[in-house]
Design a protein with these regions (language model features):
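Short alpha-helical elements
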Residues: 1-115
Length: 115
């Protein structure tokens, strides 16, 4: 668990300041995004047998928080990686994977507000 996620669990009232959306919105978004992610994953053409490959370092919820944190605060990917305990390139990859999906789920006004 990242320091940011731990902080948000401890102080949910600070979610708006840290991510640009409140804790209730984050919970709803996470639920919907996870479902959408699983749908996409099923449709994706697999190159490696199911169960193969390396496990992700961050859970899906942490990946969503990483993306929202970047959109709201604009740290470098190096700093983002340090905060979430992943490499700079992994932080970059996670951000771009989730950005596309979140753009579909969030209203344009909220995406602009986050940026």
């Amino acid at each position: 668990m990242s320091n940011i996620e731990e902080f948000l669990r401890q102080y949910p009232q600070e979610t708006q300041r840290v991510l640009g959306i409140n804790a209730e919105q984050l919970e709803k978004l996470t639920k919907i995004a996870k479902e959408k992610y699983q749908e996409r994953k099923k449709q994706k053409t697999r190159l490696i047998k199911a169960g193969g490959g390396r496990e992700a370092k961050l859970m899906l919820e942490e990946q969503i928080i990483l993306t929202l944190f970047y959109l709201h605060n604009f740290p470098t990917f190096q700093i983002l990686g340090i905060q979430f305990g992943v490499s700079e390139s992994t932080a970059h990859k996670i951000f771009h994977e989730w950005l596309e999906l979140l753009e579909e789920l969030l209203p344009a006004s909220l995406m602009e507000q986050l940026k």
